[in-house]
């Protein structure tokens, strides 16, 4: 498919402020997919480009500073799955409608997964072996982030259960300090610099088709010049068709040269599918770092396929 988007946001400057123009954003994307690549394989090619006008009358921002673009190709097949993506966001990319978490960067991200199906292993349906690589720079090609994650082995059982082991290495360039824990004079701050870290993790998950299912994972890693141990637990109950309740708990123990601290996160989520056309979902979340409880709920009503109402 090929898609397009256009948004306009009117602006009214306050007395004495720089005159603001109405903000216009235009963009296009495409997604081409085939199941007949080389006669028998799946393949996909995607891309997008977006541009917005200068918010200030007579502004001097270049078109490249006010645009973003990206492409992605993938080969999503059973034995071999490979994809690679590239995206770039201008230094002044700031559409009036919508937002991004980061701007002024280039990101390359290839992944290779090999997933054979052993013929002589009675309880093993498939094994997976994956290499994930991320390389992120600023627009002057200065390295900001580099991640290498390797999954030497993931076991997918005939029962639907899974178990995996993963190792990884991270590079992070921090240009400004930030507070990671606490407030005031007792705050623990991470200072600018270059940080490299290693990690390893193990995880196990039971099949989601069961009335009771869950998962557990443990990760040990270097963390901003110190160490972190993390435990993640989850459990789901499906008391009847169309209803589910999931609880997640995460505990982190962090040890840094500046000080030690622990964090806890608890989340409860639910889904109730009243019919094929109506569903209620939501979650409640609390963490002892912010001491804030967040609540989210949504009702979705499908009037007809392609026409949905959300509340």
Regions found by a protein language model. Give the residues of each.
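Exposed, low-structure sequence patches enriched in small/polar residues
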Residues: 36-310
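A conserved hydrophobic secondary-structure block that centers on an alpha-helix together
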Residues: 1-21
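Accessory structured domains or lobes within enzymes
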Residues: 22-24, 282
């Amino acid at each position: 498919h090929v898609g397009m988007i256009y948004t306009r946001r009117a602006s009214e400057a306050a007395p004495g402020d720089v005159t603001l123009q109405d903000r216009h954003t235009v963009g296009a994307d495409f997604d081409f997919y085939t199941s007949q690549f080389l006669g028998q394989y799946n393949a996909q090619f995607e891309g997008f480009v977006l541009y917005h006008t200068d918010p200030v009358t007579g502004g001097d921002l270049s078109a490249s500073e006010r645009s973003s673009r990206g492409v992605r190709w993938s080969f999503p097949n059973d034995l071999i799955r490979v994809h690679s993506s590239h995206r770039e966001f201008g230094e002044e990319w700031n559409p009036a409608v919508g937002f991004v978490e980061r701007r002024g960067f280039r990101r390359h991200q290839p992944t290779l997964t090999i997933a054979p199906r052993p013929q002589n292993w009675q309880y093993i349906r498939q094994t997976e072996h994956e290499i994930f690589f991320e390389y992120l720079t600023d627009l002057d090609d200065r390295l900001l982030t580099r991640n290498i994650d390797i999954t030497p082995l993931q076991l997918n059982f005939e029962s639907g259960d899974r178990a995996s082991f993963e190792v990884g290495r991270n590079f992070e360039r921090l240009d400004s300090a930030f507070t990671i824990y606490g407030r005031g004079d007792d705050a623990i701050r991470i200072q600018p610099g270059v940080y490299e870290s290693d990690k390893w993790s193990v995880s196990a998950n039971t099949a989601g088709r069961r009335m009771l299912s869950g998962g557990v994972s443990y990760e040990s890693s270097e963390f901003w010049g110190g160490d972190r141990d993390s435990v993640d637990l989850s459990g789901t109950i499906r008391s009847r068709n169309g209803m589910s309740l999931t609880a997640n708990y995460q505990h982190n123990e962090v040890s840094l040269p500046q000080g030690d601290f622990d964090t806890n996160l608890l989340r409860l989520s639910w889904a109730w599918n009243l019919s094929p056309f109506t569903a209620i979902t939501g979650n409640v979340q609390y963490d002892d770092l912010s001491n804030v409880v967040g609540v989210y709920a949504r009702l979705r009503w499908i009037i007809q396929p392609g026409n949905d109402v959300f509340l």
